[in-house]
Amino acid sequence: MDPPTPDPTRLSEGGWTLSREEAETVYESLGVSVTAHTVVYEDADLRERIVEAGGEDRVWRFFFASRLDITPSPGFGMVSAARPYVVRESKETFADELRDRGFEDVAHGDTETVRIEGFRARMTPHRARLSVDGTDVRILGAVVVWHDGDFHVAGGAYPASGLEALVDVDADAYETELLELIRAVA
């Protein structure tokens, strides 16, 4: 099974570059195995602008998309039973990813139902903080889970404020683009 393929035109026009592609077993117990096939992209243009302005060289904005390979494949009735577990684990894994990237005070908001290409999806917003040279950078993001025959998990994070001394950030535009990228995975 391959990872999902986000719209390559949208990615290149937005300055996104592939930073990682992997297949990782995320769960294995009681005869069930779950492998996440994932691609991760970063906003290389934003990173370059921040470095040129004297800021830290790091990933500031990222987007990921995963397709879950569940073996044995859950039957029709089992998808509904598995969905809450997949949503819960995806929220926690995304929060751990933010912490691994050095973000602090990671918290998630209430999960809500949204539509992704006609499929019911569960979206959970996240927020965090990144301390850079004595300044707090506010980070916002989201993780979305849906099932269209396969379980998909997609999301990302972006700076919402705190970088104004280096570059202009447009949190509303970043949020809009993140949601468009997620929808383009379907």
What are these model-derived regions, one by one?
Residues 11-12, 81-86, 90-99:
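Short Lys/Arg-enriched alpha/beta "domain-start" segment
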Residues 136-161:
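Extended hydrophobic
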Residues 154-186:
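Surface-exposed amphipathic alpha-helical segments
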Residues 90-140:
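Signature of long, low-cysteine stretches enriched in small and polar/charged residues
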Residues 14-84, 133:
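Secretory pathway targeting signatures of secreted, lumenal, and periplasmic proteins
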Residues 1-3, 64-65, 69-73, 152-153, ...:
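A composition-biased, non-transmembrane "mature-region" signal
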Residues 41-44, 128, 146-147:
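Active-site beta-strand termini and strand-to-loop segments that position acidic
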Residues 1-11:
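Secretory targeting signatures
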